[in-house]
Curated annotation (Swiss-Prot):
Gene Ontology molecular function, alphabetical: rRNA binding; structural constituent of ribosome; tRNA binding
Full protein name: Large ribosomal subunit protein uL1
A Pfam entry, by short name: Ribosomal_L1
Subunit structure: Part of the 50S ribosomal subunit.
Family statement: Belongs to the universal ribosomal protein uL1 family.
Function field: Binds directly to 23S rRNA. The L1 stalk is quite mobile in the ribosome, and is involved in E site tRNA release. Protein L1 is also a translational repressor protein, it controls the translation of the L11 operon by binding to its mRNA.
Membrane-crossing segments per the record: none
Lineage summary: Bacteria, Pseudomonadati, Pseudomonadota, Betaproteobacteria, Rhodocyclales
One BP annotation, GO: translation
Length: 232
């Protein structure tokens, strides 16, 4: 245990907390510091130049990461008729309507993401107190309330991540695993940042991407030079 601690400490000394790294170097450092016995997630925190107290500056949406997330996602779909069949054909793990709502009320929540057709929201809306705290409530802003359930399910399975600013105006997301290549992580990071830039509120003034930091589950944070992300 002592040897492991010394090794981790040695790796962490490689990270200069006062330096902002080019994205390729930052990703290499984060991967090098991911020494846990499990495949650590690679996480990003983006501090945006918004006023998080104002509703018109809330940044929320979703993006499909080109290299995936490295995680298997169980998808539930609230739909009926042809849309239910389309959801099953697209690979949804759980499909139902009022019967699925009863399962949720009974505490049987065996899924990681929830999609609903607009007409199903009269049923799903009654589950707000159950799904909301778990981050599972469908929302049109992230593409989980839609008539196009086929695309929604396929995107979820392909590696779609949702993002939303917290009270401090920071976006937290996972862009992959330590086992991913630097190139794959860079592709995912670029896709997420592109999505954030496109979602910039009109009322946001000044520098938008104020600070970007990467870390693994158990590793140190590494600051990234924002201008290097899409230029690399």
């Amino acid at each position: 245990m002592t040897k492991l601690s010394k090794r981790v400490q040695a790796l962490r000394t490689k990270v200069d907390r006062n330096r902002t790294y080019p994205v390729t170097e930052a990703l290499a450092l984060v991967k090098e510091c991911a020494t846990a016995k499990f495949d650590e997630s690679i996480d990003i925190a983006v501090n945006l130049g918004i006023d998080a107290r104002k509703s018109d500056q809330l940044v929320r949406g979703s993006v499909v990461l080109p290299a995936g997330t490295g995680k298997s996602v169980r998808v539930a779909v609230f739909a009926q008729g042809d849309k239910a069949e389309a959801a099953r054909a697209a690979g949804a793990d759980v499909v139902g309507f009022e019967d699925l709502a009863e399962q949720v009320k009974a505490g049987n929540i065996d899924f990681d993401l929830c999609i609903a057709t607009p007409d199903a929201m009269r049923v799903v809306g009654q589950l707000g107190q159950i799904l909301g705290p778990r981050g599972l409530m469908p929302n049109p802003k992230v593409g989980t309330v839609t008539m196009d359930v086929t695309t929604a399910v396929k995107n979820a399975k392909a590696g779609q991540v949702q993002y939303r600013t917290d009270k401090g105006g920071i976006i937290h997301a996972t862009i992959g695993r330590a086992s991913f290549s630097t190139e794959a992580l860079q592709q995912n990071l670029g896709a997420l940042v592109d999505a954030l830039v496109k979602a910039k509120p009109a009322a946001s003034k000044g520098i938008y991407l104020r600070r970007v930091a990467l870390s693994s589950t158990m590793g140190s944070g590494v600051r990234v030079e924002p201008s290097s992300i899409n230029a690399a």
